[in-house]
Amino acid sequence: MAKAVAIVHHADRRTDVHMPYAPGIVVTRGRLVFLSGVTAAAVYHSHPHRDEEFDLPPTMREQAVLAMENLKKTLEAAGCGLPDLVSATRFLTDVREQDDLNRVWADYLEGHLPTTTTVEVSRLATHPRCKIEISAIAVTDDLHGGPEMAPKSFNRRGDAPSGSPASLGPPRRSRRGPR
């Protein structure tokens, strides 16, 4: 079944102002895709963090481009794309750089308007030089991605059962050792 989403507007909607977001979105059909926050850093990096893995550019524009590329890749891995975004929370370390982010955001979304919330934070957990993090929700067709996208059970660390289609790569070895 195809997804069904509708933008919600107030009865007193003003059409004489530019709105870079939708006031609300109703999802009546489709599969929800929840994305962890992405930054300009590589999605897959060591935990605890290692400084040498974070070669971050200095400007908001450059970091926003890298964050949007990471967002796009994660959406594609889930079987959808940027036009499927319905909500995003954007965390910035300096809200004065929001216009730089908005320009990159508009270039990538090409007129698509998910709901957005922008929050200024003192620091992001990924790295001290990180300027932006985007957390998002998308909706895609119920069957988009095929049976390999079916819900799986996960353990408390977020790993799918070994050998299941949701398990990416070889099973992880426990750091705890034998029990």
What name fits each language-model region?
Residues 1-69, 73-87, 92-179:
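N-terminal presequence-like segments and the immediate start of the first folded domain
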